[in-house]
Amino acid sequence: MALNGPQKTVVQLVGVVVLMGGLAWASVPFYDWFCRVTGFGGVTQVAETGSDQVLDQTIKVRFDASKDRGMPWEFKPVERIMELKIGETGLAFYEAYNPTDRPVAGQASYNVAPFSAGYYFDKIQCFCFNEQVLQPGERVMMPVTFFVDPEIIEDPEAKYVHTITLSYTFHEIDLPEGYAALDTGDTSGAETELN
């Protein structure tokens, strides 16, 4: 069955809309994958263990903290700057405090500057991997374990980096279901062990 002019145009337009919707849907996971693989935009890498090689060359890591508008916590790095050898495992802490009278959940987003160093900044353990819930008046120390990959000295764009800034921004998120039930005093359906 042959399509006439208007029918052919409608089929082409529907095809374009479906194609654009598919590309829009696929762009978010593709961009996330691209940033993790290339370190684009200061996205860091995740490592299972520390580096096998430690160089004599040192690098400074600055720690920065901010909060999204409306996030009621106090949030700051315990140590503002740390100098370590490239490849050496570092341990830094951030402090968070919930001054409110209610539990507050948060999720940290992170970035590394300059962007060229993001690919070489490896986190072994980080509070940013999981959502955090602070009870009213609770103060916690949150660790991040990391190292700078020795391969940074081979990269023509990153080898002259002497200082890396690790920035975290905390965003308020909805309380997990078990915490929400405890907050309202309704224990029906609340888990006995909260993660």
Swiss-Prot record:
Intrachain S-S bonds: none
The name this protein goes by in its record: Cytochrome c oxidase assembly protein CtaG
Keyword Transmembrane: yes
Described purpose of this protein according to its UniProt entry: Exerts its effect at some terminal stage of cytochrome c oxidase synthesis, probably by being involved in the insertion of the copper B into subunit I.
Lipid bilayer topology: Single-pass type II membrane protein
Keywords on record: Cell inner membrane, Cell membrane, Copper, Membrane, Signal-anchor, Transmembrane, Transmembrane helix
GO cellular component: plasma membrane
Segments in the Periplasmic topological domain: 31-195
Gene Ontology BP terms: respiratory chain complex IV assembly
HAMAP family: CtaG (MF_00155)
Cell compartments where the protein resides: Cell inner membrane
Pfam families in the cross-refs: CtaG_Cox11
Segments on the Cytoplasmic face: 1-9
